[in-house]
Structure formats: structure tokens, C-alpha cells
């Protein structure tokens, strides 16, 4: 009882402190851009409070993503942050559909969890499975309860497919206008896709979920799509600056980005992208974005060559939908300075 009371008092104090309170919805791989996004926020306690981490299928299945998130929390010694496992699958899209699309219209650039065994949960390389387990409450229920308890105060950082969020909106449509804002990585407006030729991965993995969110009445929707993400290029020079500072986090960064994607240790000429880290950085320093525009957007949900593509919204069919602020250009020096600072800090 004392432990429960202390937890309630701590939560109340955090909400009252005036920080930006974030629900962190992720499809985390081993580290990559999702892990970097989490580290950046947790090392910025004066600016944001991470109220909880909800995991969605995308890069990997949700159970594996939860394990990776727990491992990062263990490294950061943040036992108070809870991880909630969300939807087991996208709303409609299946591995069979994805494989058939590849056969019909050409090889897909990236299939994420559709290429993996959903029952296969592995520890991070060189580690054991975390002794912690995800919270017994589901991610969708947690999202709903936090939004209902704190109307107008919650920022959702959505850096994976939007399945969890779409399910929350479908179960409780009234929470749409109680969300302060959603900052998300997903979609592409004027550049090619990175899953199929026309679709960005997060939207492609669950197009129906992305459509629900884009057509919603959430007051503010801020989009970090491929248009801006592909201007934030990581090269080995930036990689070397980070791994030169040895910490458990930079060692994990080195293992993942060095030996997996982009593989800087094997291919020094390789390049990678910061993707989800841009959306997290915006919560800490929005000034690194130098150009944006407002659009009404939708997602194609008819299965075919263009499934998951971002398209203009026909406002006649959805007159209540709120617009999307599409981020377009950035100051990379300012962004990387923030990224480097947070990833190399000593805990």
C-alpha cells in the first residue's frame, strides 16, 4: 500500500511539474532510431516526462520490441518506466499479403516483422533476457487511461506503425480531442517510399491504422516523414564521434549501427538515417526544423501496388479531420548536436 501511494504521489508530481508529458509508442528494434529516441527523452528530464512506453509491431513483433525496450531501460537504470505490449498484428495487413505484393510488384525494400517469427523473442546481443516483464495492462488500455486522466496534456510520440493508437481511437472516439498533440514518424509526400516504391514503412505496415489517425480530430498532428528524414544522414564520421565516448548506451549503439543497419564497422562508406530520432528531438528543440507546411493527408488502403501510400485527403468525405504539419527542412548541425549530447551523456 505504501509503495502504491508513493507511486501515485510521484506520478502526480511529474504531471504537475509542467513538463511535456509523453506517451512513447514504438516498434523498437535492438537500438537504432527508436532506442536513440528513447534515450534522448529520458536524458532530458527538465523538458519531458515519459509516462510510459507502448510497443507495437513494426520493425519486429511487439514482444521482441518490448524486450529491447526493457534492455535499454535496464542499461539506463530506469525501473520506474513501465513497458506495455500492444497489438499483436496490424489491423488488416498480413505477412501473406506482403509476400504476395513482393511477388506481384517487385521485391520490397524492407518487411520488418513480417520477415520474422512472432514467437521468437531473443535477448540483446551479449545480454540475457531482462528480469523485468512488460506491465500486465495492455498498451491500448494504458493509452486510453492516460489520455482520459489528463485531457489536453498528453503528447503522443508515435515512431512505429499506428496500430495501438488507432485501436485506442476506435475504442474511445471521444479521446481524439483530449490528446494535446501527436508527433509521428511516418509517411512520405514528395519522395519515394522505403518499404514499397511508393510507401513509407510505418504507414505501409498498417495503412488502415495510419488512415484512422490522419482522419482523426486530434488537435495537432506533426509529421516527420521521409521528406525530412532523408535529409538527416548519418555517416561514419558521426558514428565515430558517438562511439568514441564509451558507455553502455554507446556500446549498444555501436553494436547495432556498426554491425547491422547501416553497418558502419563493415562498410565505412555506408550511410544511414536518424528517422524516429527527429520526432523525439522536436520535443526537445523544435527550432532545428527550418521549414514546414500544412496539408490534409490520407493513406491508400485498397490492397495493390500503392497500398500504404500517403495521398491528399478528400475533405468532402472527412470534413472534421484536422490538418497535418509536414516537416520539410532542418538544420542538421543543430540536430546532431542534440543527438550527440544526449546519446553520449553519462548516467
Label the model's feature ranges.
Residues 1-7:
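Sec-dependent signal peptide recognition
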Residues 7-16:
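Hydrophobic h-region of N-terminal signal peptides that target proteins for export
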Residues 18-20, 38-47, 204-208, 215, ...:
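Conformational coupling and interaction surfaces
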Residues 18-71, 76-79, 115-231, 236:
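Active-site histidine-anchored catalytic micro-motif
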Residues 34-37, 64-65, 94-96, 310, ...:
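Short, glycine/acidic-enriched capping/hinge loops at junctions between secondary-structure elements
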Residues 60-64, 92, 188-192, 298-315:
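Short, mixed-charge aromatic SLiMs
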Residues 69-72, 100-102, 239-241:
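Short, hinge-like loop/turn segments at secondary-structure boundaries
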Residues 81-130:
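Surface-exposed loop and adjacent secondary-structure segments within mature catalytic domains
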Amino acid at each position: 500500500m505504501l509503495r502504491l501511494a508513493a507511486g501515485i504521489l510521484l506520478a502526480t508530481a511529474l504531471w504537475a511539474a509542467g513538463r511535456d508529458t509523453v506517451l512513447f509508442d514504438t516498434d523498437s528494434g535492438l537500438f537504432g532510431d527508436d532506442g536513440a529516441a528513447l534515450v534522448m527523452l529520458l536524458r532530458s528530464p527538465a523538458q519531458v516526462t515519459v509516462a510510459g512506453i507502448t510497443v507495437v509491431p513494426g520493425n519486429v513483433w511487439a514482444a521482441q520490441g518490448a524486450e529491447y525496450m526493457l534492455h535499454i531501460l535496464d542499461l539506463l537504470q530506469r525501473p520506474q518506466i513501465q513497458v506495455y505490449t500492444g497489438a499483436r498484428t496490424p489491423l488488416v495487413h498480413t505477412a501473406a499479403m506482403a509476400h504476395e505484393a513482393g511477388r506481384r510488384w517487385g521485391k520490397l525494400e524492407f518487411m520488418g516483422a513480417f520477415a520474422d517469427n512472432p514467437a521468437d523473442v531473443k535477448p540483446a546481443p551479449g545480454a540475457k533476457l531482462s528480469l523485468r516483464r512488460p506491465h500486465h495492462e495492455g498498451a491500448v488500455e494504458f493509452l486510453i487511461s492516460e489520455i482520459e486522466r489528463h485531457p489536453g496534456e498528453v503528447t503522443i510520440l508515435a515512431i512505429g506503425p499506428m496500430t495501438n493508437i488507432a485501436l485506442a481511437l476506435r475504442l474511445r472516439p471521444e479521446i481524439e480531442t483530449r490528446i494535446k498533440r501527436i508527433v509521428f514518424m511516418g509517411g512520405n509526400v514528395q519522395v519515394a517510399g522505403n518499404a514499397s516504391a511508393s510507401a513509407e514503412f510505418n504507414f505501409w505496415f498498417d495503412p488502415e491504422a495510419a488512415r484512422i489517425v490522419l482522419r482523426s480530430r486530434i488537435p495537432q498532428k506533426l509529421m516527420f516523414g521521409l521528406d525530412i528524414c532523408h535529409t538527416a544522414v548519418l555517416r561514419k564520421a558521426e558514428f565515430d564521434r558517438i562511439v568514441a565516448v564509451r558507455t553502455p548506451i554507446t556500446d549498444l549503439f555501436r553494436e547495432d549501427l556498426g554491425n547491422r543497419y547501416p553497418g558502419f564497422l563493415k562498410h565505412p562508406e555506408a550511410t544511414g538515417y536518424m528517422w524516429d530520432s527527429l520526432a523525439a528531438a522536436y520535443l526537445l528543440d523544435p527550432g532545428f526544423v527550418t521549414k514546414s507546411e500544412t496539408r490534409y493527408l490520407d493513406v491508400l488502403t485498397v490492397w495493390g501496388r500503392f497500398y500504404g501510400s500517403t495521398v491528399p485527403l478528400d475533405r468532402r468525405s472527412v470534413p472534421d479531420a484536422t490538418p497535418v504539419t509536414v516537416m520539410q527542412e532542418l538544420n542538421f548541425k543543430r540536430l546532431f548536436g542534440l543527438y550527440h549530447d544526449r546519446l553520449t551523456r553519462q548516467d
